[in-house]
C-alpha cells in the first residue's frame, strides 16, 4: 500500500484486552442501551463518555415517547404553553456537555460539592438555551446524580451494581441542602409530598422495587415507555401536578393513569392527553422518573 500511496499512513486497529474493537458491536450495544456490554469494546478512559451518552439517550427516549398525557412530545406541547419539542431537544443538547463533565469528574470518586457546582452551571446553560424556560431542571438533578455515581462505579470497579449505586447516590444527595422557594419545595411543604431530594437521599426505592422491574418486564413492547410512564404516575407524588392542580389534580391523574393501564390503547393515550390539557395537568415529575428508569436500566447489572 505504501508503494501505491506514498503518503498513506497505516493506523493499527484499536484493541481491548488483546482483541480488536468492533465498531459495529459497540454501536449495537449502545443502541440497546447496555453499558456492561459496551464496556467490553472500549478502553477504560472512554467509559465516562459512554455513561453520558446513555444519559442523553434516556432523556431523548422520554422526549420522543409519543403521545404522552399532558407532556411535550413529537405531536404537541401537552399542557405547556412555554415549551415545545424543539425547545426540549435544544435543552438536552445544552445539558450534554455537563453530563459528560459530571461523568469525567466522578470517574475516580464522588464529590458532592463538584456535582452541585457542575449542576448549577448546567442549569444556567439550559436556561440560556431555552430563553429562561425550565425544561429539564428535575431531570438534570436525578440524572446528574446518577451519572456521577454510575461513572464512579464503572471506572473503579468495572461494573455498576445496584447496592453500591444506591449507596453512592444516597451519600451524595445527603450532602446537598434542601432547596427553598421552588415549585417542588412549595408543593412538598403544602401537601406533605416526598420531593426529589428526599427520593434521591433514599436512593429511589420505588424505582428499584417497582418501576425498573416493571420496565424490564415490558421488553419488546412498542408501548414500553408509555406504560411505564403511566405506571409511575400511579405511585409518585408528582410535585409538578401538585403545583399546578393540587391534591385533587394528583388524585385525578393517578386514577386516570391506572384506568388506562387496565385497558391500554394508543387512542386512550390521546384521549388522556386531551383531558390533561383541559385540566392543566403535566406529570413532569413522572417524566423525570421515566428518564431515570431508562437510564438506570441501561447501566445497572442487577436491581437488588
Regions found by a protein language model. Give the residues of each.
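Catalytic-loop motifs flanking and including active-site residues across diverse enzymes
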Residues: 22, 91, 139-143, 225, ...
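Long, hydrophobic/aromatic-enriched structural stretches that serve as scaffold segments
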Residues: 97-149
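Active-site cores that bind ATP or allylic diphosphates and position pyrophosphate for catalysis
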Residues: 1-50
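Short coil/turn segments at secondary-structure boundaries
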Residues: 39-42, 137, 244-245
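Phosphate-rich cofactor/ligand-interacting catalytic cores and adjacent structured alpha/beta frameworks
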Residues: 48-108, 112-116, 150-274, 280, ...
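Residue-level signal for helical boundary/lining positions with a hydrophobic bias
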Residues: 132, 280-281
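Contiguous, well-ordered alpha-helical segments that form the cores/surfaces of helical PPI scaffolds
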Residues: 124, 140-152, 231, 290-297
Amino acid at each position: 500500500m505504501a508503494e501505491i500511496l506514498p503518503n498513506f499512513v497505516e493506523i493499527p486497529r484499536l484493541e481491548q484486552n488483546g482483541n480488536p474493537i468492533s465498531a459495529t458491536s459497540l454501536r449495537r450495544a449502545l443502541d440497546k442501551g447496555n453499558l456492561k456490554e459496551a464496556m467490553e469494546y472500549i478502553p477504560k478512559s472512554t467509559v465516562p463518555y459512554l455513561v453520558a451518552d446513555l444519559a442523553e439517550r434516556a432523556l431523548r427516549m422520554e422526549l420522543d415517547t409519543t403521545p404522552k398525557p399532558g407532556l411535550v412530545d413529537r405531536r404537541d406541547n401537552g399542557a405547556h404553553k412555554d415549551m415545545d419539542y424543539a425547545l426540549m431537544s435544544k435543552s438536552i443538547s445544552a445539558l450534554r456537555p455537563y453530563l459528560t463533565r459530571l461523568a469525567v469528574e466522578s470517574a475516580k470518586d464522588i464529590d458532592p460539592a463538584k456535582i452541585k457546582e457542575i449542576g448549577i452551571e448546567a442549569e444556567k446553560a439550559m436556561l440560556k438555551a431555552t430563553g429562561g424556560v425550565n425544561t429539564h431542571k428535575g431531570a438534570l438533578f436525578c440524572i446528574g446524580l446518577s451519572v456521577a455515581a454510575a461513572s464512579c462505579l464503572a471506572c473503579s470497579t468495572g461494573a455498576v451494581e445496584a447496592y453500591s449505586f444506591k449507596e453512592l447516590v444516597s451519600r451524595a444527595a445527603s450532602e446537598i441542602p434542601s432547596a427553598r422557594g421552588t415549585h417542588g419545595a412549595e408543593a412538598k411543604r403544602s401537601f406533605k409530598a416526598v420531593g426529589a431530594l428526599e427520593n434521591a437521599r433514599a436512593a429511589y426505592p420505588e424505582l428499584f422495587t417497582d418501576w425498573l422491574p416493571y420496565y424490564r418486564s415490558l421488553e419488546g413492547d412498542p408501548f414500553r415507555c408509555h406504560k411505564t410512564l403511566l405506571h409511575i404516575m400511579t405511585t409518585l407524588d408528582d410535585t409538578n401536578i401538585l403545583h399546578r392542580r393540587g391534591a385533587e389534580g394528583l388524585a385525578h391523574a393517578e386514577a386516570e393513569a391506572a384506568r388506562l393501564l387496565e385497558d391500554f390503547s394508543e387512542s386512550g393515550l390521546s384521549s388522556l392527553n386531551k383531558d390533561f390539557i383541559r385540566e392543566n395537568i403535566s406529570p413532569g415529575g413522572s417524566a423525570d422518573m421515566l428518564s431515570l428508569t431508562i437510564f438506570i436500566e441501561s447501566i445497572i447489572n442487577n436491581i437488588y
